[in-house]
Amino acid sequence: MTEFNEGWWNCFCSFANELANVSSSASMVIRNVLDGAGVSKKEITDNLKTQHFDKRVVEELEEYKAKL
């Protein structure tokens, strides 16, 4: 399961970074993906340390994490 989670976060990072650069509705899509995946505060915190998210995505993740 660890490998799956790492792969999921790698894909999410690429997807979210690209989406944030091209879409005005990126926030809604990112939140829906996170809701659907059932991510936890710990997962977000850990991945903010290891992944290279764009600034806008970091802000979205921090906001999402605060609401969990």
Language-model regions, residue ranges each:
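N-terminal acidic leader/helix
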Residues: 2-27
